[in-house]
Every structure is written in structure tokens, then in C-alpha cells.
Amino acid sequence: MVLVSGGFDLSVGANVALTSIGSATIMAGVFGASPDHATLAILAGFATAIAIGIGCGLANGIGVSYLNVNPFIVTLATASVFQGFTLLISQGQEVSGLPRLFVHQIGSGLILDIPIAVLLSLPVIAALYLLMAWSRYGRYVYAIGSNQKAALVAGVRIPLTLLITYVICGVVTAYSSFLLTARVSAGEPLLGAEFPLQSITAAILGGCSLRGGQGGVGGAIVGAVFVTVLANGMDLMRLGSNHQLIILGFVLVIAVLLDRERTKLGYASMAANVRKVLSTRGAQNPDRSSARAVDR
């Protein structure tokens, strides 16, 4: 959504880490004080995760939409701030002592051989798809990404729309972090360090453009699946994490080059359509064309 609006969010990895540590700390504290109320501890951790996601999204959204700072600079700065808070809270240590219900059911549980975490992700994906494809807000996001000046003339409330976009991005990132925390069984201060690279790569491979105005939830999911399969394949080949980052970096460069060529083809097709329309109008009005030639 942020890329479609013509922006960036380089703070997703730091958001994941901060949410993981924050939610795990609250969850472990509530569960330690009342071991018989695991569900209450999980709900407290979830509420903390969503609150952190909203806070991160507001920080990015206000900087981009109301302070008019470049999204790259804003999210790079907030990533540093979020990571600093993460290390300050955790002191660089993981947070354990989470409820077994959270770790074994949400983190590694299965329903019909499908991970529960995947099933919990489906409603969010469906909601995002409907929001982008069928709502007025989604049309506003595409309009802003395509041509911000035209969107402003059309009456789109650009600052508010961008603020909502970054808040939604922050909340979805926090939700993903909550599920990942269940998966790794602890709050991790370095969780999601590779997310900025992976998320941008997946989005571009899925059809999003760095210039904004293009892409969708379905394509982003396909791109994410491709990146995940690629990562799993490299794990099976026993490639180290450093080698994986190098390969993923090359994949991102290739994806950006393909996006540039796709944009060029789009402009060429648009120009061809304009020429076709103009030539058709000229053929339909030969008298006017002749009159213009005589005047010249």
C-alpha cells in the first residue's frame, strides 16, 4: 500500500523487532503474574502489538504527510528510533516465558495440515484486498501514487490518506510480528532485520512500481511467496545468511530494472494510444484538418 501511494517504509524491520519485544514483555509479565490466565496474557500481548503498530504508523505518517519530509528519510530515521527503543527495553536479550498456548497453538499448531498462523493471516489479506480494490480509499491511494497534483485537484485529502496508509502498514507489520513471535517462541530484538529488503523485493516482483500508482495485494502475495520459496531453497542448499542477502540483493536489482522497463513500455503504449486517437479524429474531420493546413 505504501509503495502504491508512491512512498517507502524502511522501518518495517525495526517495527517487527519492537513489536516482538514489546508484546512478549507484556505477555510474559501477565502470564508470570497469573499462570492460569494464558488467554488474558495473549490478549494483552496482542493489544500491545497493535498499539505499537499504530504508534509506528503514526510516526511515519505524520512525518510524511504533515511535515512533508521525504518518506525515505522519515522511515530511515524512525527505523533507527524503533531499533533503539527495542534494544533499550530488551537490553539485547530475548524475552522468553511465553504461554504454551501461544507458542504451541498459534506458533506451530495445524488445522487440516495448514499452519494456524497462515489461517490467521487470511482475513487480514482479504480485508486489505477489499480495501484496495473496492473502496474509495483504495482509489485515492492509486490516484496519489499516479499523480499527486491531479489527486489534489480532484479533491483527494492527501495528508489524511497518506497518514491512514502508513498506520495500516504499521498495524499489519505489527500483526505479522505477533505471529512471528509465536513462531520463534520468544521476543527477539533482531527479528525482522531482513524485512525491508524482502518486502520491497516481493512487492516489486508482484507488480508494484517504485514510482507509485501500480500494484495490488494479490501481486504482492505472489511476490512474497516467490521470495519465501527462494529463501527456503537457499536454506536447503545450505547457503549461509550472508550469501542469501547477496542473492536477494541481486534479485531486487533485477526487479527494479524490470520495473523500469515495464514503465517505459507503459509510457510507449500510452503515447501510441494518444497518436492513434489523434489520427482517428483527423480522419473523421478532414475538412477541419484541411482548414488548419490552409491557415498555416
Please describe what each predicted stretch is.
Residues F31-A79, V222-G223:
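Alpha-helical transmembrane segments within multi-pass membrane transporters and channels
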Residues G61, T75-R100, L128, V167-S185, ...:
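Alpha-helical transmembrane segments in inner-membrane proteins
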Residues T173, R183-G249:
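Transmembrane alpha-helical segments in multi-pass inner-membrane proteins
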Residues V153, R157-L160, M234-R296:
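Cytosolic-side transmembrane-helix boundaries in multi-pass membrane proteins
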Residues M1, T25, V30, I54-L67, ...:
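Membrane-interface helix caps of multi-pass small-molecule transporters
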Residues M1-P35, I62-V69, G207-V217, F250:
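Single transmembrane alpha-helix segments in multi-pass membrane proteins
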Residues A41-A49, G55-N60, V64, D113-E188:
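Helix-loop-helix "hairpin" substructures at the membrane interface of multi-pass membrane proteins
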Residues F82-L110, K149, S185-A186, S241-N242, ...:
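Extracellular/periplasmic helix-loop junction at the C-terminal end of a transmembrane helix
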